[in-house]
Regions:
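Short hydrophobic beta-strand segments
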Residues: 1-11, 38-49, 151-152
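Long, low-hydrophobicity ectodomains and other hydrophilic envelope-associated domains
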Residues: 17-19, 23-25, 29-32, 52-55
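Short, well-ordered secondary-structure micro-motifs within conserved domains or adaptor modules
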Residues: 32-67
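Functionally constrained cores in energy, signaling, and assembly domains
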Residues: 1-3, 21, 32, 45, ...
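Feature activates predominantly on carbohydrate-active enzymes
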Residues: 9, 14-17, 21-23, 59-61, ...
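Secondary-structure transition/capping residues
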Residues: 29, 33, 116-119
């Protein structure tokens, strides 16, 4: 996982959760990298307007962000070759806004078989020794038909609030 210093705090937090999901599936925790560092394959993620890496890839003609630019909570998956020096192939998850990037990261978890309910009722994924994602995963998400979608619990502080604080540090994704 290419960890960009400029990434939004909530996006960084979710990237960490997705790394845990990958570890649940493979038994191996993906390394975080801050440069190419000789990595054969990598996951790069960023939010338009908050990611110099996305800007550089787009300027070099390696990444097309026009399909998601300006679209509420949209993200794209693009597998590209040699995105950065030292990285052979990368899955680039780009979001138009913070939630778009977060939904894109969680889409990766779904692709490898992790249920969104893994934290709620311990729905553990099937073990896989390897996970292969190729250009068949290239896609652009649709604009959601409902803005501000989410799971809202208004009066359950005792149970849900304490659970959220234990697992996420607070009730807000930051």
């Amino acid at each position: 996982f290419y960890e960009e210093a400029q990434a939004l705090p909530g996006v960084k937090r979710v990237a960490g959760m997705v790394k845990q999901d990958i570890e649940l599936v493979t038994g191996v925790s993906p390394a975080g990298i801050t440069s190419g560092q000789g990595s054969g394959c990598a996951v790069l993620y960023g939010t338009i307007g908050h990611s110099p890496m996305l800007d550089a890839l787009e300027a070099a003609g390696k990444l097309d962000l026009n399909a998601i630019r300006g679209k509420w909570e949209c993200y794209s998956f693009q597998v590209i070759e040699t995105p950065l020096a030292g990285i052979g192939t990368a899955l680039v998850i780009a979001g138009n806004d913070k939630r778009g990037t977060i939904y894109g990261l969680f889409h990766l978890s779904e692709l490898i078989g992790v249920s969104p309910l893994v934290n709620w009722n311990h729905v553990l994924p099937r073990h896989q020794d390897t996970v292969v994602l190729d250009d068949r995963v290239n896609m652009v998400s649709r604009v959601p038909s409902v803005k501000y979608r989410g799971f809202f619990i208004n009066d359950e502080w005792t149970a849900f609030g304490n659970w959220a604080k234990t697992h996420f540090g607070s009730m807000n994704a930051a």
